[in-house]
Amino acid sequence: MGKRAVVTGVGHYLPSRVVPNSELETLVDTTDEWIRTRSGIERRHFAADGEQTSDLATAAAQAALDHAELTAQDVDAVIVATSTPDLTFPAVATMVQARLGMTRGFAYDVQAVCAGFVFAMANANAMILSGQADRILVIGAETFSRIMDWTDRSTCVLFGDGAGAVVLEARDGTGGTADRGILSADLNSDGRHRDILYVDGGVSSSQTAGYLRMEGKEVFRHAIEKLAATAETALAKAGLTEADVDWVVPHQANLRIITATARKMGIGMDRVVVTVADHGNTSAASIPMALSVGVARGQIKPGDLVVTEAIGGGLSWGSVVLRW
């Protein structure tokens, strides 16, 4: 018998303000048709004035706890994946911990940009397998609208705000691929490519938050090359292949990347959970939100084999394979 980290609850939160492409047409030199054609995005959500990443994260976390029929006091740890924290420190995770009324365990943030949730899930899995924790809240939360340069029309139209969360619980398994829970993970980084996707501000450099800068064509090239490969590697680690996959839940960067990656994996789009049209690119929040939406839609069901994959600034990229 072996231990597995099993998803027992999911939840997400979207700010109430919906920003359709037509609204962005009034802010920058763009069109609804251009945005849809290039990205597949139709609308996104922006946090309200005064609404911060920790607010979004807390709401998503509470939804996941409710789904798992747990309270905050049942949880041993909180891990938040974010690149847009409320403050330089303390961690958003500690703010979430306090707001949930959790007075035990530990909390910390993970920063791997759009790949952050995959890294956080792998981290939480290791914590559970090592006996450090039995129940962990893993959250992806972002307010990317706060780091948009509204004169950069090719980039500012792509991003949105939101948060998603899962509850991971230790459960007994057989060690086989039929077990529920995380079966494998593959994580990668290559800092040589850090200049194609970054924020031009920071505490020890400019003492400003800065704005997101992206070389879209280069990011697209790396995404197509690396996402299918990391998913294939993670599947192989579990002794599985693409033919075993029920659902791919990718980072919702844009529809062209999602479609090209699925094609490269040999998986039809009818087996891919897609939320990018409604959410835009929400960085580390995109996969947990897509998991939550996939469950709510009735797509992801118990026993399904799910593959998540993401790439973000760093560059950092990875995949987690799990049985729902």
Swiss-Prot record:
Predominant cellular place of this UniProt entry's protein: cytoplasm
Pathway field: Lipid metabolism; fatty acid biosynthesis
SUPFAM superfamilies reported in the protein's UniProt record: Thiolase-like
InterPro entries: ACP_syn_III_C (IPR013747), ACP_syn_III_N (IPR013751), FabH (IPR004655), Thiolase-like (IPR016039)
Domains as described in the record: The last Arg residue of the ACP-binding site is essential for the weak association between ACP/AcpP and FabH.
Start and end residues of each stretch annotated as ACP-binding: 252-256
Name by which UniProt lists this protein: Beta-ketoacyl-[acyl-carrier-protein] synthase III
Family: Belongs to the thiolase-like superfamily. FabH family.
UniProt-listed Gene3D superfamilies: 3.40.47.10
GO cellular-component term (any): cytoplasm
Job description of the protein: Catalyzes the condensation reaction of fatty acid synthesis by the addition to an acyl acceptor of two carbons from malonyl-ACP. Catalyzes the first condensation reaction which initiates fatty acid synthesis and may therefore play a role in governing the total rate of fatty acid production. Possesses both acetoacetyl-ACP synthase and acetyl transacylase activities. Its substrate specificity determines the biosynthesis of branched-chain and/or straight-chain of fatty acids.
GO molecular function, a single term: 3-oxoacyl-[acyl-carrier-protein] synthase activity
